[in-house]
């Protein structure tokens, strides 16, 4: 059958293909016609980026369908995402991609909704609005994917200045862990933080559930003076 490939310059290329042709194979045909190396090609159909190992029929691409060819910037790179089951997913990304964007790509590959994904790199949980380059994530870096349990919840932390911080936590998170999240958001070292809930100072080794801290609970953050106890 014939399909069309439209480039960003508006040029349309016609290709002779079989439904069983793989995406790599199609990229090879584009290279033969246009001289563009496959690793610089990104093919889009119905808003989805096509993965090399899949076939045209996998994506329901039929005769006279039109694919869109986007050139991968030299900054394009691959990163790896390792799940708790030990499976490793490979993603094609740009340094400028946001974390939301990466979660969307994981959903496209694995079917996991972004709101159930927590991505960790170098021990830090990655925030949706930030980009890969913000976290200095470079080519062939490995991120860790932790599934947010249905028990995932939000809590609030109120500072002495009256500011309220929202945190995504699990009931099983330790107090140290919560202090780490506060440091990630606010830059306050954990050893300067004292967290108070229901009039009690929270101990590092305990968990939120130990203190019966539930969703939308409010903790109070008091700064520990240097040299204070």
UniProtKB/Swiss-Prot annotation:
Residue span(s) of the pro-peptide: 229
Cross-link (Glycyl lysine isopeptide (Lys-Gly) (interchain with G-Cter in ubiquitin)): 6, 11, 27, 29, 33, 48, 63
GO cellular component terms given for this protein: cytoplasm; nucleus
Residues in Ubiquitin-like domain copies: 1-76, 77-152, 153-228
Highest taxon, organism lineage: Eukaryota
Subcellular location: Cytoplasm; Nucleus
Keywords: Cytoplasm, Isopeptide bond, Nucleus, Repeat, Ubl conjugation
Cross-link Glycyl lysine isopeptide (Gly-Lys) (interchain with K-? in acceptor proteins) per UniProt, renumbered positions: 76
Entry annotated with the keyword Cytoplasm: yes
Main location: cytoplasm
InterPro entries recorded: Ubiquitin-like_dom (IPR000626), Ubiquitin-like_domsf (IPR029071), Ubiquitin_CS (IPR019954), Ubiquitin_dom (IPR019956), Ubiquitin_ubiquitin-like (IPR050158)
Note: For the sake of clarity sequence features are annotated only for the first chain, and are not repeated for each of the following chains.
Family assignment from sequence similarity: Belongs to the ubiquitin family.
Function text: Ubiquitin exists either covalently attached to another protein, or free (unanchored). When covalently bound, it is conjugated to target proteins via an isopeptide bond either as a monomer (monoubiquitin), a polymer linked via different Lys residues of the ubiquitin (polyubiquitin chains) or a linear polymer linked via the initiator Met of the ubiquitin (linear polyubiquitin chains).
PANTHER family xref list: UBIQUITIN (PTHR10666)
Name of this chain's protein: Polyubiquitin
